[in-house]
Amino acid sequence: MAPEPHHAIVAYPGGLRGRWSWGGSGQGAAVFALSESGGSLTDHGPLAGPDVESYCRAELRIEGPGGTWAARFASPIFDEPRGVLWDSAGILVATYGFTTYGFDPRSGDLRWHHRSATPIVALLGSSRLEHVIVQAEIETFAIEADGTVGWRVAHSDVVTEADLLGGRVVLTSFSGQVTSLDPTTGRASY
């Protein structure tokens, strides 16, 4: 018997309320069974690959001053979705599996998407940065407001954790190595 889908309620700045639902491989019907009606609904699953019905699935529903919208996602691996409102750029950034998505937070229109070669570990945003930082298992990259990659850093070990601390991107690898990057340039700082 498959486990029940997971659910999370989140609040984003600007009066946005989000509800995430996600589940394992082939659980799309269970994840979407409790979808609420009203507002627009767009399935971005095909951006993850060809056979999305066998993939893990997720749904994000946003309610806010600009209206209600929902987006569906797919991933070939089980993942917990994450999101951050990049208020200075006016973009709701979400990640699921290998893909990062940039949405208009009021309408839900997809402005851009970026697919990583490895699963995404963390999504970091700050109003002090001109980009969001996406941490995948073996690369760190900065995505600009228009969806272009501002900089990219490859790693020789799998990154298991990432955070913005003291004005630095601090990465912990599978072997326990800690690396610090300048969040504006991606250059290593010691």
Feature names for model-found ranges:
Residues 2-4, 12, 58-78, 105-107:
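A short helix->beta-strand "capping" segment at the edge of beta-propeller domains
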Residues 6-9, 15-38, 43-50, 70-89, ...:
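Repeated scaffold domains used in trafficking and secretory/extracellular systems
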Residues 56, 88-89, 96-98, 128, ...:
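Short loop/turn segments that connect beta-strands within the blades of beta-propeller domains
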Residues 66-76, 109-115, 147-154, 190:
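A short beta-strand motif characteristic of beta-propeller blades
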Residues 85-114:
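Extracellular-facing segments of soluble proteins and assemblies that are Gly/Ser/Thr-biased and enriched
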Residues 101, 141-142, 179:
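WD40 beta-propeller blade core
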Residues 105-107, 144-148, 183-185:
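Short loop/turn segments that connect beta-strands within beta-propeller blades
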Residues 171-190:
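Blade-level signature of beta-propeller repeat domains, shared across WD40, Kelch, NHL, RCC1
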